[in-house]
Amino acid sequence: MKKYRKITLILLLIVMGMQGVKAQDVGFSQFYANPLYLNPAFAGSKVAPRISLTYRAQWPGLVSAFTTVSGSYDQYIPDLHGGIGAILMSDRQGDHGMLGTTTMGAMYSFRFRVHEDIYINLALQASLTNARLVWDENTMRWPSQTDPSGGFINTSSAVAPDKTSIIYPEFASGVMVYGPAWYAGFAAHHLNRPSQGFYSEDRVPIKYSANAGGLINLSEERRRQSSLGLGQPVVSPNFIYQYQGGFHYFNYGLYLDWMPFLVGVWYRNGIENSDAFIFMVGVQQDYFKIGYSYDATVSELANSTAGAHEVTLGILLPVPEQKHKIKAIRCPSF
């Protein structure tokens, strides 16, 4: 019985996605390991060319219901007075990837100084998304076909949509304000509210994201300039808030960065319910970083979903020669 409850939950979630019912974006736990996804204003924020890779398996207890792979590249271009970036993300839902989306995006972030060591980044992003449905009546099962005692016993009257693949453009914008040891940002995605439903014209709700944090050196020794927190303990408290389609998400916690090790813990919740505790460990060198996080679900879905696993990889390439030294945003990399 428990098995069929899990399958039914998967199908209900997929049907909601097919019909465009308050579709929600994928949520990553290691926000700053996938910075361009959080806010396009992060493009070029590290100055050096940066490659970011993320793999996320959400709710593996539901037959790998949600699997997401993301990759991005960005760097600062002095002649453009800002950073450029590109992101590619693929998301699969359901057994055998029944419902999937692939998004390709490009962005530009203009940077300017407002006061001594205080800077602002303003960014625009354009993306193209392909949503696709694998319609196979031999393997698809619907909630109306289930019987708690006997499994799948009924026939389905579900009708295939006219199109099983749709492509649509979308746009986003963002802003970042930062100083020597603090940062804050705001971003809005799906500004044009594209329709992604296979059966209806329901539109993707705009996603609003706000983030803020700081860096606190626990050692009184003068920090080295070659690498953030090299060999010294640094605590980074941070906060992220997101709103989309009537749903609120709060994520607050901190990192402890003690080169070459990094650990973090956060708590994520909505307004009326708890979601998960997030635990992260990582290893880093000057130009190479890898992290792993686990979402320990504390909501009513805890017994069925088995949380979420996320693995990230970050690579910084050598900085091209520049006439003037450019300051990077000093925020976590995981």
Pin down the residues of each PLM region:
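Subset of outer-membrane beta-barrel
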Residues: 24-334
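Sec/Tat signal peptide C-region and signal peptidase I cleavage site
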Residues: 18-23
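Sec-dependent N-terminal signal peptides
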Residues: 4-16
